[in-house]
């Protein structure tokens, strides 16, 4: 069976997929969405681990649509998974978006036909769907990063990945628990499970640089975040600040400010909680290594004072940082270091000597076995392109996406790829995923997507494809910004990019400049694209 009466196919029902379906449907396009989960919510539907919560304040992490505010009120300043699912249910009630999705079905392949100028999407249940446009909206949190550790199948107890946590109740109370990974989910797991476990052993690859969710125990708000009481104003601000969270950096370089004034400023930002210390700090935080070290030293002094165990203090908050502060998105914590400082919690450094194997009863490292009853993999997801690769996409002449990206990711605007006509990626590689509020990025991308598809329909364009030249131009624009920052000092390299001596760069110019690039493309007659009209192809 093949569904053929479609204009657009959208894969994924997280923020980007939901918004794309809603906006395109409002424009009158025939849209069909597919989602492997049973309901809306994307990563929030899957991430059921203890402590799962949003790491940004409530006015900004939502759809930028004032209509949704009419009968909705956020209860939590940093919404938990439960509140996020309640929010998606509210969105569904308002927008009736589930009517345009099929749930519980996975996409096994997607292929473009030059003969018909249409995409065919194959589903795992054997059905197919065809449409002019194909919109993968799977983000970069859809493919799990499972470490390859010998002996995993031998372990007698349960092994949980945070993104595949059982939705049924799982109790860690009174158990000996091992946690591998100290990224965002690791931080939340450690805070939640560490308080009730009999023993917890944390395997740390590198120290996790965190910021206090609340600047002090008595605080419940971030005073220095531009967070107006009027949520509509907050939504406007979210699209008019570079980070999408309303934070504005101080318009001074760090070392131009006297040390006493500097430390007073750091103290203000630190006590504000949230990401104020990072996003509302001095403007050269992630550009000047001396400025960056100055900020790190202040943070380290405050954080080290919370850890009484000397050995743990050096592991968790070293005096010399492993990487520049803020080039990785800081995790937010409430009492992480107090939990890790407890005697029943052990921290093992695996930066130089990896885990050897998993036995029936524990984890062997440094020649010794750590006994445990449950293992938690807080190891996150694959690289930003892993979700797209999992869809087995083939473009013009049957070229596989994996082959097109054999030397690393290439794109135009982080949304389109040469040899893959009529395919627009939402919230994928090479767009502002690192430093910007994701719903804000998605909002401007979907606005651009809708304008592109509407223009093509009006102009009789049946095929729109990014040029190979546009890849080079986008790479050059990214590099001009990237090379001025400290991000290149700790750039991640996949095996393929390492072989090609390329860094996995992303857009670090923020939301305002990115939106300008999208607008320039539209204003300059779809710059960077080649278009074929219906009369040129013979398709009527």
Curated annotation (Swiss-Prot):
Using the UniProt record, name the top-level EC class of this enzyme in a single word: oxidoreductase
In its keyword annotation, does this UniProt entry include Nucleus? no
Cofactor info, note text: Binds 1 FAD per subunit.
Q: How is it used?
A: Loline alkaloids show broad-spectrum anti-insect activity, and different lolines may have different biological activities. In vitro tests of NFL, NAL, NML, and semisynthetic loline derivatives with long carbon-chain acylations on the 1-amine have shown that many are effective against both fall armyworm larvae and European corn borer larvae, but the effects seem to differ depending on the modifications. N-Formylloline reduces the weight gain of fall armyworms by deterring feeding, and does not significantly affect corn borers.
Q: Which Pfam families match?
A: FMO-like (PF00743)
Instruction: Supply the EC number(s).
Output: 1.14.13.-
Residue numbers binding FAD: 43-46, 55-58
What role does this protein play? FAD-binding monooxygenase; part of the gene cluster that mediates the biosynthesis of loline alkaloids, potent insecticidal agents composed of a pyrrolizidine ring system and an uncommon ether bridge linking carbons 2 and 7. Lolines are structurally differentiated by the various modifications of the L-amino group and include norloline, loline, N-methylloline, N-acetylloline, N-acetylnorloline, and N-formylloline.
Record flagged with keyword Flavoprotein: yes
State the source organism's domain of life.
Eukaryota
Which residues form each disulfide bond in the chain? none
Family matches, as SUPFAM superfamilies: FAD/NAD(P)-binding domain
Family the UniProt entry places it in: Belongs to the FAD-binding monooxygenase family.
The protein's organism comes out as Epichloe uncinata (Endophyte fungus)
Task: Identify the gene encoding this protein.
Answer: lolF1
So, what pathway does this thing act in? Alkaloid biosynthesis
Name of protein: FAD-binding monooxygenase lolF1
Which keywords appear in this protein's UniProt record, sorted alphabetically?
Alkaloid metabolism, FAD, Flavoprotein, Monooxygenase, NADP, Oxidoreductase
Q: Do you know what upregulates this one?
A: Expression is induced in loline alkaloid-producing cultures as well as in planta.
Q: Where does NADP(+) bind?
A: 53-55, 182-188, 205-206
* Taxonomy of the source species: Eukaryota, Fungi, Dikarya, Ascomycota, Pezizomycotina
């Amino acid at each position: 069976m093949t569904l053929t009466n479609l204009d657009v196919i959208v894969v994924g029902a997280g923020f980007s997929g939901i918004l794309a379906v809603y906006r395109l449907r409002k424009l009158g396009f025939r849209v069909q969405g597919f989602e492997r989960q049973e309901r809306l919510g994307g990563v929030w539907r899957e991430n059921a681990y203890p402590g799962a919560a949003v790491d940004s304040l409530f006015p900004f992490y939502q759809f930028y649509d004032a209509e949704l505010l009419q009968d909705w009120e956020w209860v939590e300043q940093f919404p938990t998974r439960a509140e996020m699912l309640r929010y998606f249910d509210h969105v569904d009630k308002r927008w009736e978006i589930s009517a345009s999705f099929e749930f519980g079905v996975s996409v096994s392949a997607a292929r473009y036909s030059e003969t018909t100028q249409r995409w065919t999407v194959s589903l795992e249940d054997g059905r197919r769907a065809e449409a002019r446009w194909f919109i993968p909206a799977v983000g970069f949190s859809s493919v799990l990063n499972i470490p390859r550790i010998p002996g995993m199948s031998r372990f007698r107890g349960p092994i949980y990945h945070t993104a595949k946590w059982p939705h049924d109740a799982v109790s860690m109370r009174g158990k000996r628990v091992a946690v591998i990974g100290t990224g965002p989910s690791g931080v939340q797991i450690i805070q939640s499970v560490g308080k009730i476990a009999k023993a917890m052993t944390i395997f740390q690859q590198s120290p996790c640089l965190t910021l206090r969710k609340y600047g002090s125990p008595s605080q419940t708000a971030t005073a220095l975040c531009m967070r107006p009481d009027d949520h509509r104003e907050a939504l406007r601000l979210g699209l008019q600040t570079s980070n999408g969270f309303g934070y504005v950096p101080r318009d001074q370089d760090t070392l131009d400010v006297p040390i006493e004034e500097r430390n007073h400023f750091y103290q203000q930002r630190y006590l504000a909680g949230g990401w104020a210390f990072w996003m509302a700090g001095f403007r050269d935080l992630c550009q000047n290594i001396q400025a960056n070290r100055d900020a790190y030293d202040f943070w380290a002094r405050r954080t080290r004072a919370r850890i009484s165990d000397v050995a743990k203090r050096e592991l968790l908050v070293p005096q010399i940082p492993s990487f520049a502060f803020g080039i990785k998105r800081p995790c937010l914590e409430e009492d992480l270091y107090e939990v890790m400082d407890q005697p029943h919690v052990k921290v093992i450094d695996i930066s130089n000597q990896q885990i050897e194997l998993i036995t029936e009863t524990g984890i062997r490292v440094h020649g010794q076995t750590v006994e445990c009853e449950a293992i938690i993999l807080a190891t996150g997801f694959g690289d930003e392109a892993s979700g797209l690769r999992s869809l087995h996409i083939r473009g013009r002449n049957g070229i596989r996406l994996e082959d097109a990206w054999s030397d690393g990711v290439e794109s135009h605007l982080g949304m389109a790829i040469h040899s893959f006509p009529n395919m627009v990626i939402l919230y994928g590689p090479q767009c502002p995923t690192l430093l910007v509020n994701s719903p804000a990025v998605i909002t401007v991308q979907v606005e651009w997507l809708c304008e592109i598809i509407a223009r093509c329909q009006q102009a009789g364009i049946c095929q729109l494809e990014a040029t190979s030249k546009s890849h080079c131009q986008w790479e050059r624009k990214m590099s001009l910004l990237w090379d001025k920052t400290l991000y290149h000092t700790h750039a991640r390299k996949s095996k393929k990019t390492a072989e090609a001596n390329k860094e996995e760069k992303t857009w670090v110019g923020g939301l305002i400049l990115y939106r300008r690039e999208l607008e320039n493309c539209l204003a300059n007659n779809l710059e960077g694209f080649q278009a074929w009209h219906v009369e040129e192809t013979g398709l009527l």
